[in-house]
Curated annotation (Swiss-Prot):
HAMAP family associated with the record: Succ_CoA_beta
Keywords, ordered alphabetically: ATP-binding, Ligase, Magnesium, Metal-binding, Nucleotide-binding, Tricarboxylic acid cycle
Highest classification ranks of the organism: Bacteria, Pseudomonadati, Pseudomonadota, Alphaproteobacteria, Rickettsiales
Bridged cysteine pairs (disulfide): none
EC code: 6.2.1.5
Record GO cellular component, one term: succinate-CoA ligase complex
Record GO biological process: succinyl-CoA metabolic process; tricarboxylic acid cycle
Binding, ATP: K46, E99, A102, E107
Keyword Transcription on entry: no
Note describing how the cofactor binds: Binds 1 Mg(2+) ion per subunit.
Stated name of the protein: Succinate--CoA ligase [ADP-forming] subunit beta
Subunit-structure text: Heterotetramer of two alpha and two beta subunits.
Organism: Orientia tsutsugamushi (strain Boryong) (Rickettsia tsutsugamushi)
Length: 386
């Protein structure tokens, strides 16, 4: 789960990470009051969307005049902000953060991530802050400092010293960085965050470290024990089909292809997407109905897939173990009849009660194409949408 910048800063400040004074505006009519309330000579007006690169699209403005700041915020509200991360469709601005401008001497980068490949938490830092860190990692990887931390021992002074030394920080700045790293580590562990980025982490003219921008991602599977974090969810920022799938307890990721996929098991789902690509087409989604799906969940899965206007055909690939193929067939029929499905549908069933499942589908009056195996299923659906 992603959250907005102002929410990330709110969390970080609770762990004593320094931030600039700011006010989040959640209603258009609160703009004037918020700007009047912020004691500063220079206002920074920031669009709040779940995407980076906001400045490029006009989502960050600076003003030394209070009235101008109000007009900038009002013009920003409701705009369709297009950035390199939103894609051409952009994202509608429905929240704004007004912040006091900082006097910057230097911009750094600091991040921490759950590093599954190395089974640890990895801190990353760079003197090239304020810009796209992925681009820095690609063009100048030597600029990225990495420190791996064993989750059993936690962050230790020598971890901080490595980053502090390589960044060239001394004296009070070194102490500040050590405190911020310790705070970020504690926050990541305590909130079930998977990624924390402070970019830039600035050094001010009076040698103070301040988190000028922040991004935090959280583990969706752990939200049940993080009610405060869950309360920060902004459903307007999420894909409506992915949100609908989450509420139905379905693992669904929307993609850019035109062949919808319904599969049980993540590994089988990825194999299904791979073979669709092998036949020259593109999957429209990843959807795992899980091993214990019932008729209702299967029906909802088909409705979600068919709600994507890019989908021109659907491939259902089920290997029945715990899940029975006849349950899948009944759910598919119920949903197909309810939504009056009119696009090609290819179904491959194998495993528990697959004969009964095939019989249920074949006895229906719907135009459903049966497949003998995965290769046959992929070939048939690609041919059907070509």
């Amino acid at each position: 789960m992603n959250i907005h910048e102002y929410q990330a800063k709110e969390i970080l400040s609770k762990y004593n990470v320094p931030i600039q004074p700011g006010i989040a505006i959640l209603k258009y009519e609160d703009i004037d009051y918020a700007i009047d309330s912020l004691a500063t000579d220079t206002f920074v007006i920031k669009a709040q969307i779940h995407a980076g690169g906001r400045k490029i699209g006009g989502g960050i403005k600076i003003s030394n005049d209070k009235n101008e700041a109000k007009n900038l915020a009002k013009n920003m509200w409701g705009m369709n902000l297009v950035t390199p991360q939103t894609g051409p469709k952009g994202q509608k601005v429905q929240r704004i953060y007004i912040e006091s401008a900082a006097k910057i001497k230097l911009e750094l980068y600091l991040g921490a991530v759950i590093d599954r490949s190395n089974h640890c938490i990895t801190f990353m830092a760079s003197s090239a802050g304020g810009i796209n860190i992925e681009e820095v990692a690609h063009t100048n990887p030597d600029k990225i400092i990495k420190v791996k931390i064993n989750i059993l021992t936690g962050i230790q002074p020598f971890h901080s010293r490595k980053i502090i030394f390589q960044l060239g920080l001394t004296g009070d700045l070194a102490k500040q960085m050590a405190k911020i790293m310790s705070a970020v580590y504690s926050m990541l562990i305590n909130t079930d965050a998977t990624q924390v980025e402070i970019n830039p982490l600035i050094i001010t003219l009076d040698d103070k470290l301040i988190a000028l921008d922040a991004k935090i991602n959280f583990d969706d599977s752990a939200l049940f024990r993080q009610p405060l974090i869950q309360g920060m969810r902004d459903e307007d920022e999420e894909d409506h089909l992915e949100l609908r799938a989450t509420k139905a307890d379905l693992s669904y990721v929307r993609m850019n292809g035109n062949i919808g996929c319904m599969v049980n098991g993540a590994g089988l789902a990825m194999a299904t997407m791979d073979i669709i690509k092998l036949y020259g087409a593109e999957p429209a989604n990843f959807l795992d109905v899980g091993g214990s799906a019932d008729k209702k969940r299967v029906a909802e899965a088909l409705k979600i897939i068919s709600s994507d206007q890019n989908v021109k055909g659907i491939l259902i690939n089920i290997f029945g173990g715990i899940m029975r193929c006849d349950i899948i067939a009944e759910g598919v029929l119920a949903a197909a009849k309810e939504i009056n499905l009119s696009i090609p549908l290819v179904v491959r069933l194998a495993g528990t009660n697959f004969e009964l499942g095939k019989e249920i589908l074949s006895n229906s009056k719907l135009q459903i194409v049966a497949a003998n195996d995965l290769d046959d299923a992929a070939r048939k659906i690609v041919e059907a949408v070509s």
